[in-house]
């Protein structure tokens, strides 16, 4: 009797694990697409899309502390809009990993960021370890926290 219960319990657990795998795979694919969409929007200065993905009240911990922590507020939108009017800016992930745990998505990796002042053509390149935390809310992934940690000092590129 005890043996039968153990076998049934194991079968139930195995069935649950097998059935939950497609949902995890779908969540992982959605997380990757959302994160890639965020950086595409960021790299093209599409602040509307950036602030659709960035959750109101989200925390940004920049490496250089040149900007305040940003939320989806009028001040944050205005600051970044002004920044993109005067700079060309893009970020590239070199090695990125994704993990989904329930309704929480984790993205971490190595990132290179380039910023060029449009008026002068001078620029800098930054090298970071970046971690972004997403939360799935109403079927959509939203970034709630991002932290950049510099790997080496910034480099003048022009």
Regions flagged by a language model, labelled:
Residues 12-14, 18-56, 103, 155-158:
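Short, low-complexity N-terminal intrinsically disordered segments enriched in polar/charged residues
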Residues 98-106, 121, 134-140:
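A short, structured loop/turn motif at beta-sheet edges
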Residues 28-30, 47-102, 122-125:
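A solvent-exposed, acidic/Ser-Thr-rich amphipathic alpha-helical stretch
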Residues 86, 114-124, 152:
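Short, cysteine-centered beta-strand-loop-beta hairpins and adjacent loop/turn segments enriched
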Residues 127-154:
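Short beta-strand edge/turn micro-motifs at domain boundaries
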Residues 54, 111-113, 147-150:
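Short beta-strand segments enriched in hydrophobic/aromatic residues
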Residues 103-115, 128:
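A short hydrophobic beta-strand element
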């Amino acid at each position: 009797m005890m043996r039968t219960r153990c076998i049934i319990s194991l079968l139930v657990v195995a069935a649950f694990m097998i059935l939950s795998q497609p949902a995890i795979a779908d969540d992982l694919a959605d997380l990757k697409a959302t994160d890639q969409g965020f950086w595409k929007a960021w790299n093209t200065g599409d602040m509307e899309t950036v602030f659709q993905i960035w959750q109101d009240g989200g925390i940004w911990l920049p490496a250089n502390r040149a900007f305040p922590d940003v939320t989806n507020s009028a001040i944050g939108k205005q600051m970044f809009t002004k920044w993109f009017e005067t700079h060309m800016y893009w970020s590239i992930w070199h090695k990125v990993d994704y993990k989904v745990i329930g309704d929480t998505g984790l993205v971490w990796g190595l990132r290179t960021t380039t910023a060029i002042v449009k008026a002068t053509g001078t620029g800098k390149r930054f090298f970071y370890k970046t971690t972004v935390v997403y939360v799935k809310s109403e079927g959509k992934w939203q970034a709630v926290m991002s932290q950049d940690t510099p790997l080496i000092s910034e480099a003048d590129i022009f």
